[in-house]
Structures are given as structure tokens and as C-alpha cells.
Regions:
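Short acidic, glycine/proline-enriched helix-loop-strand junctions
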Residues: 142, 147-157
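Helical mechanochemical/support elements of P-loop NTPase systems and associated helical scaffolds
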Residues: 17, 56, 71, 97, ...
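N-terminal cysteine/histidine-rich coordination modules
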Residues: 1-81
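Short basic, glycine-rich beta-strand/loop surfaces that mediate nucleic-acid
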Residues: 153-196
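Conserved nucleotide-binding/hydrolysis micro-motifs of P-loop NTPases
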Residues: 28, 64-66, 138-141, 163-164, ...
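Short active-site oxyanion
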Residues: 56, 111-112, 129-132, 153-155, ...
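Extended interfacial segments that mediate partner engagement and assembly in macromolecular machines
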Residues: 64-141
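N-terminal targeting/trafficking signals and adjacent low-complexity tails
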Residues: 198-210
Length: 210
């Protein structure tokens, strides 16, 4: 059995640029942070893709950090100008990160680097090098290494429901999926690591494990 706590991913960084968290003042990799920008209406917007124009403000990708920054008016203090923040900022970020993960999985599927369904996953594992094996968070099946041919460095991910996985494949539900080793695996694991910072501690659907 795997542990029920979130196991932080120890993977190589693709982005070596670092930024300072405006709350903790820690210097962190951008891949561990959430970027924010201020719109023309002085409303703070989370920029999870890091592409929006404007000055970037950064916070660690942790729910408690984001909530504390909003409650303490950190954005206003740093900008020295009154700005507004969504009352549900942390939940908004979780939704955006989850959507980003869905988009990455959709790209992997269209590129032929992701398959879903127990039988197809088995065939995939026998012929390709798996980077991520996804088991639906609401699955009643054992979360153990049932299949053979699983690479020792493959990661098991349990943070997406069968309905979420089903949407990737235009089906009602999918319990098992696998993504080949490579850039899709690297990028998705980085996003899942950020996403895991916004799960509730008591929520057992969220973890990455080997």
C-alpha cells in the first residue's frame, strides 16, 4: 500500500529561473510557484501558465500560503496600491491547475503518448516505456503494482477521478491510464506537484507515489 500523505515529487527541473515568494520571501523555482498579475481593473488574476502580460507577483503553490497572502493584503502592500482579490482565490487556482493538467493529458492522448482502459494500458506497458500510471481516485481496485512490465522509475498518480479521466478519452469513465516517458510526463508531474499544494490534508484522493 502507498502512504496517504502527499509525497512531493523529486524530479529534475526544466525551468532554472527562480523568483521570490512575496509572502515568505523564500527564493523558489518558478515551477514551485504561482504567478499573479494585476488587470486594468486592479483585480489580481492567477496566471498558472505564466504567460499573461504585466508585472508578475509570485506565491508558493500552497493553499495556506495563497490564503494567508489574500487575507493579509500582501498584494496591496507589495504594489503600494489598493487591489482586489477573489474571495475564493485558492479554489480558483486549484481549478485552473486541474484544467491545465487535463489539457496536458489531452495533448498526450492526441500525440499517441497516452492510452486509457485496463486492457490498453496492459498492451502499452508491454511495448512502451511508461512514465506515469494514473489510477482513478474513486477506483475500488487495489492501488498496487498489479501489472508487470512497469518501469521502476514510473510514477503512480491518484489525483484524478474516473469521470475526469473519461473526459480525456470522450468516455463516461476511465479507471486506468498511462503516459509514456518523456516531455509529457515531465510537464504533467510538475503541474500535479503544484496542484497537490491545494488539496485539503484530509482529502485522500491526492498523491503521487512510486
Amino acid at each position: 500500500m502507498f502512504g496517504r500523505e502527499v509525497v512531493l515529487l523529486k524530479s529534475a527541473r526544466s525551468d532554472k529561473n527562480m523568483r521570490k515568494c512575496i509572502l515568505t520571501k523564500e527564493l523558489c523555482y518558478k515551477s514551485d510557484l504561482i504567478r499573479f498579475v494585476v488587470g486594468p481593473n486592479k483585480f489580481v488574476v492567477p496566471d498558472v501558465a505564466g504567460r499573461l502580460p504585466g508585472r508578475g507577483l509570485w506565491l508558493k503553490a500552497k493553499k495556506d500560503i495563497v490564503t494567508a497572502a489574500c487575507d493579509k493584503g500582501i498584494f496591496t502592500n507589495v504594489l503600494k496600491d489598493k487591489v482586489s482579490v477573489p474571495i475564493d482565490m485558492a479554489d480558483l487556482i486549484e481549478g485552473l491547475l486541474r484544467k491545465r493538467c487535463h489539457e496536458l493529458m489531452g495533448m498526450a492522448r492526441r500525440a499517441g503518448q497516452m492510452v486509457g482502459g485496463y486492457a490498453k494500458v496492459g498492451l502499452f506497458l508491454s511495448s512502451k516505456d511508461a512514465g506515469i500510471i494514473i489510477v482513478a481516485s474513486d477506483s475500488r481496485r487495489s492501488r498496487s503494482k498489479e501489472k508487470t512490465n512497469i518501469p521502476p522509475d514510473a510514477k503512480f498518480v491518484f489525483c484524478f477521478s474516473s469521470t475526469e479521466l473519461g473526459r480525456i478519452f470522450d468516455r463516461d469513465k476511465i479507471v486506468y491510464a498511462v503516459i509514456s516517458s518523456g516531455s509529457f510526463t515531465t510537464n504533467l508531474l510538475l503541474e500535479i506537484k503544484r496542484l497537490s499544494g491545494f488539496f485539503k490534508e484530509e482529502n485522500e484522493r491526492s498523491y503521487i507515489s512510486k
